[in-house]
Amino acid sequence: MAFAPMGPEASFFDVLDRHRESLLAALRRGGREPPTGGSRLASSSEVLASIENIIQDIITSLARNEAPAFTIDNRSSWENIKFEDSVGLQMVSHCTTRKIKSDSPKSAQKFSLILKILSMIYKLVQSNTYATKRDIYYTDSQLFGNQTVVDNIINDISCMLKVSRRSLHILSTSKGLIAGNLRYIEEDGTKVNCTCGATAVAVPSNIQGIRNLVTDAKFVLIVEKDATFQRLLDDNFCNKLSPCIMITGKGVPDLNTRLLVKKLWDTFHVPVFTLVDADPHGIEIMCIYKYGSMSMSFEAHHLTVPAIRWLGLLPSDLKRLNVPKDSLIPLTKRDQMKLDSILRRPYVTCQPFWRKEMEIMADSKMKAEIQALTFLSSDYLSRVYLPNKLKFGGWI
């Protein structure tokens, strides 16, 4: 079904263009400060030297008949996090730490696992080869136990060495998808065209390696869920609202999806919007894209896009559109705890409109998925809701 008449193309994108001008003006007024701490893209020689220094410390401890230990920044405490509107959540420079002792029953196994993965990283960097987190796990799956153990240790090492995961020569398999008005060349020379069709393109596993990015997109739309993303593809949304770019992280975004969103913003400075469910989980996912997460706060400068705006689904939209009660879902106790947690986070104080939307949700004790809009029509999301939001500036 075609869109309702909206006047000439230029007038449709008028509000979007003004929004972009305001974003560019904000960048000119101050913009984002260059990284002063946290991780960075380090040279191979720097990474090798850092690992050698750690091993030297272990040898020195053993020579003194002392039990060696790793000192790891505590990535799970809000006390170690500071908030800056231009960066998001980032780790403070002098944060609290924890000791991973080799002679403690509670941490001896983790000490040995860190040492093993450090050894693997050293060999990867030295030989200029790469491995995925999954590859590392399967070198000894029984020893590691599960993939999460490997993931956490790699993040701890990245934080300990103050370098990015890419500098460790460790890649992660991407689960995200991208479609729309975007072309680029991958590190191996492969030319990729994301022109929207029936299928999308997988987010590359090496975002730093892609080059020659080209787009005419007026905006980037981050879609929380794969099902919604696929529905918009089926509805030919990218072509109907061309030029644009759509991305999904299929729920909580992986590192590569976040890196890609950041790269698109840094390269093109076009408005970036999120489309998430009107529930605490969707709001948290949006916050991860915009302000980052506590566990990855040491990489904030490489991952966050504070210019992101919340396009939908807003809790206030539910009443405005008369979404029937049988399409709404009661908040669970877990939902309420999550919502309370988000409301207490430092970035909410600078987002009064977000706070208002979350308070509407808390007061109603109801949530809704994007699919709730299908009560109006099966293609209401792509035909009416999103075009009107984008044309008339319905974001916060």
From Swiss-Prot:
Its EC number is 5.6.2.2. It comes from Homo sapiens. Component of a topoisomerase 6 complex specifically required for meiotic recombination. Together with TOP6BL, mediates DNA cleavage that forms the double-strand breaks (DSB) that initiate meiotic recombination. The complex promotes relaxation of negative and positive supercoiled DNA and DNA decatenation through cleavage and ligation cycles. Essential for the phosphorylation of SMC3, HORMAD1 and HORMAD2. One of its GO terms (molecular function) is DNA binding. This is Meiotic recombination protein SPO11. GO terms for cellular component: chromosome, telomeric region; nuclear chromosome. GO terms for biological process: double-strand break repair involved in meiotic recombination; female gamete generation; male meiosis I; meiotic DNA double-strand break formation; meiotic DNA double-strand break processing; meiotic telomere clustering; oogenesis; ovarian follicle development. The active site is at residue 138. Heterotetramer of SPO11 and 2 TOP6BL chains. Interacts with TOP6BL. Keywords: DNA-binding, Isomerase, Magnesium, Meiosis, Metal-binding, Nucleus, Topoisomerase. Pfam families: SPO11_like, TOP6A-Spo11_Toprim, TP6A_N.
